[in-house]
Design a protein with these regions (language model features):
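Conserved small/polar residues in nucleotide/adenosyl-binding loops
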Residues: 150-157
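Unchanged
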Residues: 1-146
Length: 157
């Protein structure tokens, strides 16, 4: 926590290591700042099989892309908005959230922050439409990295 508290950064990006993509964070941070959100979650809306979703976090969102509920590892399929496990927030919000979680014995960002507090926090979605792949096996790791070599990212302004 000492490193975080002494950082001069105003915003922080939290990212898991189970997604392969080539992502430019600048427009995501800019969208986060513009929206005034507590947390901005990078997500993709698409049609998914139950196998694709069973290890994912799924967001229900309103017309303004505000998260209204969070499902963790749901047994669903079809069109849904799934998390890429990339989140933007202010450094101050992160420190406050971590301190509160530690005081309460909370250990899960998805369950204790996103799911439990989605109605009291302003959690917004940044819709990501470029190539990504979730990793859940050695085979998916290999296939995803090969695909990334041959998939050119869409240009962004």
């Amino acid at each position: 926590m000492s490193f975080i508290k002494h950082s001069r950064a105003k915003y922080v990006i939290l990212s898991d290591c189970d997604v392969v993509t080539n992502i430019d964070y600048k427009p995501i941070v800019a969208a986060h700042i513009e929206s005034g959100a507590d947390i901005t979650a990078v997500a993709h809306t698409g049609v998914y099989s139950s196998d694709d979703i069973k290890t994912s976090t799924v967001f229900n969102v309103d017309a303004d892309k505000k998260v209204t509920s969070v499902l963790i590892n749901p047994a669903i399929s079809g069109t849904c908005t799934t998390s890429l496990n990339v989140f933007v927030m202010s450094m101050d919000f992160l420190i406050e959230t971590v301190n509160d979680a530690m005081a309460r014995g909370n250990v899960s960002f998805e369950r204790n922050i996103l799911q439990e507090k989605c109605r009291e926090l302003k959690i917004k979605i940044y819709e990501y439409d470029n190539y990504f792949s979730k990793l859940n096996s050695p085979e998916s790791y290999f296939k995803s990295n090969i695909c990334l070599l041959y998939t050119s990212p869409s240009p962004r302004d």
